[in-house]
Amino acid sequence: MFCSFGLFLVSTQQQANAAAVDKQTQTQLHDYLKSHHINGVILVNGKGSQAVTIANNETTNKKKIVKANRLFPTASLQKIVTGTAIYQLTQKKQLEWDTSLNTYFPQIDGSEDITIRELMNHTSGLVNNDRPAVPLKGQKQQIAYMLEHMRNDHVHTWDYQDVDYELLAAIISKQSHSSYNAYIHRNFAKPLHLHQIKDFSEVAKKEVPQPMDPAVDWHQVTVTTSSDFGAGNLFISPNNYWKFIYNYVLKDPKMITEFYQESQKQEVAYFGGVYLMVTLSVLTVVFQVTMLALSLITRPRK
C-alpha cells in the first residue's frame, strides 16, 4: 500500500451544504486509521462547513508525516476537477454530452462512435494501461504518449480507465485554446485562492510525504503522475482540495443533480469523476478512495 486520500460528502439536491460529521463519527474514523496502522489524514465536514482534519501518525519521520496543508498526488481524485471543467464548457455551450470524440481526435479508431458522455462515465471502450520508462515532459508529450498507446475495444460497457479523463483534459485544452493546467489555474485555483496546487513537474520530492514502503521511489511517483494527464498529474494539499469541493462543487447543486441524472443511465452510478447514489431522498456524492501508487495515506510494510 502506498498513499491514499478519500473525501466523502453528503448533500441534498435542494441545498448544497455538506452535513457536519459528529464527534462520535470523527472518533470512529480516527480509530479506523489507528487500528489499520494508516499513516495519514481524513478530512470531514465540521461546524460552519469548515474542514476538520483527523490525523494518525505511524512514524516519527517528518518526511513521511501526512499533513492537511502539504502537497499530495491527487491520483483519481483529480477526475472530479476535470469533470467539473468539462461541465463548465457544456454550460458555455462550447460542447455537449453527445459531442463526438471525432470532433477533436478523428485519428482515434472508432472516435465517431464515442461521445463526451461516454468519456465522463467510463463507457468509451478505450483502454490504456501502459506506463512510460521515464517521466513525460509537458502536455504535448503526454497527449502523444496517450494516443500512441491507447486501443479501442469497441465495447461500450463500464470500464474504469484513466485514458477517458486524459482525453477529456486534452479536449479542455483544445476547446479553451490553452493548456489544461492553465485552464485549471484560471478557472479554479485563482478564483478559489488555491495556493497549494502544482503540476507534477513543479513538485520537489521534499514537498510531498514520502511512502512508508521503501519499494516505492520518487521515480515511480513521477512516471505515474506524468502519464495520468487530467487524471492524476496534479498535486494538491488536502485543504485546497477541500476548498475546491466545498466552495465550487457543492455550491453548484445544478451540476451535482445533472451528474446524478447522467450516472443513472448506466450499470455503475458514476459520472464526471464521482460515484453518485440516492438514499432516502438525499443525494450522496462519494469521492472515491483511491488505492494507487500515488496516494496520500501510507501504511508501514509488514
Predicted regions, residues:
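Active-site-proximal loop and beta-strand segments within enzyme catalytic domains
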Residues: T60-Y160
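Sec-dependent N-terminal signal peptides of Gram-positive bacterial secreted proteins and lipoproteins
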Residues: M1-A18
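Short N-terminal segments immediately surrounding and downstream of signal-peptide cleavage
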Residues: A18-S35
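Ser/Thr/Asn(+Pro)-rich, low-complexity disordered segments
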Residues: Q14, A18, T284-V289
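A short, well-structured edge-of-sheet supersecondary motif
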Residues: H30-K64, S281, S295
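Extracellular/periplasmic catalytic domains that process cell-envelope and extracellular macromolecules
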Residues: K34-H36, I65, G110-D113, R151-D153, ...
